[in-house]
A protein has these predicted regions:
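Active-site glycine-rich loop that binds ribose-phosphate moieties when present
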Residues: 179-199
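Charged helix-capping and loop-helix junction motifs
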Residues: 218-226
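C-terminal functional extensions of proteins
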Residues: 249-326
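Extreme N-terminal starter segment of soluble prokaryotic enzymes
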Residues: 18-22
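A short helix->loop->beta-strand "cap" motif at the edges of active sites that frequently abuts
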Residues: 42, 232-236, 297
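Short, flexible loop segments at boundaries between secondary-structure elements
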Residues: 233-249, 304-307
Length: 326
C-alpha cells in the first residue's frame, strides 16, 4: 500500500482515502470514474452538469444529475448508461397510445424522481436542495452539487434549427448538421456558492472524461467557475475523453468539430489549457504527449478505459497517485 500524507489529508491507495476531492462531471461518460473515486474516498464532491436539464410532460428532468445518483446508488441501467435498471415503461406506452410524443423514454420508477423534483421546485426548493435530499434518500455519502440553481440549457444550432441537446441526440439521433453550440441562460446564471467552496477547499480537482463541449462546457460557462479553476490550475487533473479520434462515450467528436476543436486528445488539452495542470491520456496516444506539454501541462499515460468496476477503481487510484505531487 502506498501512502501519502500532506497537511490535513491522507491518500491511502488501495484502501479508503480521506481526501478533499472534487470532480466536474456529466453523466454517462463520467459516472464510471465517479464510482471508482467513491470506492476510494470518503470525501468526494461532484459538480454536476445542468445543461441537459429539460422540461418534459410538465416534469423537470435532470439526466446527468440522475445518472450520477443512480450510479452511486447502484441502480443505474449500465447497459444503456442512464435510467434505472429493470425499470418498466407503462407510462410511456400509455402516453404513446394517447398520441403524445415519447421520444425521451422515461421509466416508471425514474418518473418518481422527476415528479418529486418538480413538486419540490414548485414548493420553493432549489435544485441544490432537492439534489441533496435525493442523494440522502439513497444514502449516498458523495456530495452532488449542480453547477447552478438557475436554468441553463445546452442548445445545438443545426441545419434544421435550434434544438435542445436532448432533442438533438435522442429525438433526432444526432443526425442534423451542427453549426454551433450555445449555453442558453449561462450568462444570467449565478454560480452555486457550494461549487466554488468545493473547488477552493479541494486538494485535487478532476475533470471527468466527459464530453468537453456538452458536459463540461456548460459548467465552464457558469460565471465564476472557469475563473476559479484557473486559480486552482496546479491541482487540476483532466482525463482525456478521447482515445485517438474516438470518443470513449457519446458524440463528443461531432460537437468538437462544430466548435473547431481538434478531434484528438491534443484538441481537448488545448480547450482546457488555461485551467488544467495535468492531463491523462491513453498509452496509445503517447505520441501526443510532447505537443500537449507545450501548453505547460504535465502529461501522463495509462489505460483510461473503464469496462468494469475494477477498471473504475484502477483509474481512480492512478489519478490519486498522480496527485501526490500537488
Amino acid at each position: 500500500m502506498t501512502e501519502y500524507c500532506a497537511e490535513n489529508y491522507t491518500l491511502q491507495l488501495g484502501y479508503h482515502i480521506v481526501a478533499l476531492i472534487t470532480i466536474l462531471a456529466g453523466g454517462t461518460g463520467s459516472v464510471k470514474l465517479i464510482r471508482g473515486l467513491a470506492s476510494q474516498t470518503r470525501e468526494l464532491t461532484v459538480i454536476s452538469n445542468i445543461g441537459d436539464n429539460i422540461w418534459l410532460h410538465g416534469l423537470y428532468v435532470c439526466p446527468d444529475i440522475d445518472t450520477v445518483i443512480y450510479g452511486l446508488a447502484d441502480i443505474l441501467d449500465k447497459s444503456q448508461g442512464w435510467g434505472i435498471r429493470n425499470d418498466s415503461f407503462g407510462f410511456i406506452r400509455q402516453m404513446e397510445m394517447l398520441g403524445e410524443q415519447t421520444w425521451f423514454r422515461l421509466g416508471d420508477r425514474d418518473l418518481a424522481t422527476h415528479l418529486l423534483r418538480t413538486n419540490m421546485l414548485k414548493n420553493g426548493k432549489n435544485l441544490s436542495e432537492i439534489t441533496d435530499w435525493m442523494r440522502n434518500k439513497y444514502a449516498i455519502s458523495t456530495k452532488i452539487i449542480p453547477a447552478t440553481d438557475n436554468p441553463v440549457e445546452t442548445k445545438i444550432i443545426t441545419d434544421v434549427g435550434e434544438l435542445h441537446i436532448q432533442e438533438f441526440w435522442v429525438k433526432f439521433r444526432g443526425e442534423p448538421k451542427v453549426t454551433d453550440i450555445v449555453y442558453a441562460g449561462a450568462e444570467r446564471s449565478r454560480v452555486n456558492p457550494d461549487a466554488i467552496h468545493a473547488l477552493k477547499r479541494s486538494k485535487v480537482i478532476i475533470i471527468a472524461p466527459a464530453n468537453p463541449v456538452t458536459s463540461i462546457g456548460p459548467i465552464l460557462a457558469i460565471k465564476g467557475i472557469r475563473k476559479e479553476l484557473i486559480l486552482e490550475r496546479k491541482k487540476i487533473i483532466a482525463v482525456s475523453p478521447l482515445i485517438g479520434e474516438r470518443a470513449i462515450s457519446g458524440p463528443a467528436v461531432k460537437y468538437m468539430r462544430a466548435l473547431k476543436i481538434q478531434n484528438s486528445p491534443l484538441g481537448v488539452a488545448e480547450y482546457y489549457s488555461d485551467f488544467v495542470g495535468t492531463f491523462i491520456i491513453s498509452r496509445t496516444d503517447r505520441n501526443l504527449a510532447a505537443k500537449i506539454s507545450r501548453f505547460n501541462i504535465k502529461v501522463y499515460e495509462t489505460d483510461i478505459t473503464m469496462d468494469d468496476s475494477k477498471d473504475e477503481s484502477r483509474l481512480a487510484s492512478y489519478l490519486l497517485k498522480q496527485s501526490k505531487s500537488f
